[in-house]
Amino acid sequence: MSDVTFQFDPKQQFQLDAIDATVSLFSGQPRSGQAGGNLSIEVGGGTGEGLYQHALGLGNQLTISRNQVLKNLQAAQDKQGLMPDSSLIPALPDDTDAPAPMNFTISMETGTGKTYVYLRTMRQMHAEFGWSKFFIVVPSVAIREGVKQSLRDTDKHLRELYNGEPMDFFVYDGKKPTELAAFARNSCLSVCIINIQAFIKDADVDHTMEEAKRSGNVIYKP
């Protein structure tokens, strides 16, 4: 039986609009690429003292201010006829300069190609801003497998749109911390697919510093 090949239309305007709306949130961000940081991951068998791998990790770097992101968000909402938000979520004091999370919701109708849009959005962010680390958080194993297949199915098509740039991906496994270490060090466009349970596992547990080091969950650290 012959293999099935999917044909993707790269010019669906509603999909391009969704990608542009997301990328425009960071308008003004230079192509600064990645910032370095220290990485410590347990690679032993989880018994005794354990073995820790120390390395330099690379992460996406956002240099524009939260206020600029808010202005970009309001412009994107106004363009779509939505009521502009007055603050980012979560809201922080005006004098806060420290890095902080920002949550955005992008809504699309069922059957409009949401997976295609967010996979292509990651590539567009890489092309414009140099960002190369992305997480896809899924609620179930079935959806995780579907995402993996979508990454395979769209690979050739998206490479053709983005100068042959490959996109590496893997499924997070707490028993294989070296894979996460490689992801953190890698400067290539990379995606980690992770079940939401990997975050929930430790989120409700109070850790001492030593317990945090030894936690089997290296994604979430208090």
Language model segments and positions:
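RecA-like P-loop NTPase motor core of helicase/translocase proteins
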Residues: 1-222
